[in-house]
Amino acid sequence: MTKFRTESDLIGDLQVPADAYYGVQTQRAIENFRITGTKMGDYPAFVKAIGYVKLAAAQTNHALGLLPDTLLKPISEACKEVIAGKFDSQFLVDMIQGGAGTSVNMNANEVIANRALELMGYEKGDYLHCSPNDHVNQSQSTNDAYPTTVKLAVIMMNKTLIEKLQLLIKAFRKKGQEFADVIKMGRTQLQDAVPMTLGQEFEAFAANLEEEIARLQSNANLFLEINMGGTAIGTGLNAPKGYAKLCAENLAKLTGDAFVTAANLVEATPDTGSYVIYSSALKRMAV
């Protein structure tokens, strides 16, 4: 028989599975957004990325004197476990949900907070000691943490894609050498045209993919500009001075990617141009 614990928010009390690392906000989202059946935990790159974002935020808040030593260690450890994939099964919010990612952000905040509580010897849901909002989500908003997470996830997935394309290029090169002396007819306008080697055809495939890799990498670099520290609408309300720059630096150190703070956070917060441009590279590669 499933056991439950009671958690509360501004709406009221709600039963949450006792062994769940998520909390009341996630439980409400699970009940409210039964749309696709595909959960955010089905995207390990996203979960890993949000773990990095929350870890960078915790380090930044600690450096600026907002997060005490007693919370930095357990929150950091919880974030690292999220990054390692230990809690993918706890990210149960539907991939399509209202609020521009608020439910997913809270899913992460609650999982990290409850794991931190556990590490400190407290019961899950005892948010007086470690709060999903006041501590894990400190100096953040869904509107900067969520898009930064998506950008990092795409960067990681782009690297994986490029690795696979490089393997395909290597295979094409090998075939190019293998069939270097095999003559075939080249075709134009659906008709035989002039002779070529089968090896030349495979070499052309390889060259084409090399161009696609260059375009993918160039376009993915646009995701390195983030709006952490902009909070809700880019004005930086509730984030301390210096937070944006330091958070980007911390995220860069953690991931090895050269993240920088956007020049204008108000503009950057709603901007989706980088996704459009990167999508064009994916479409070109597919064609």
Across the structure, where does each feature detected by a protein language model lie?
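Conserved, well-structured ligand/cofactor-binding cores
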Residues: M1-V287
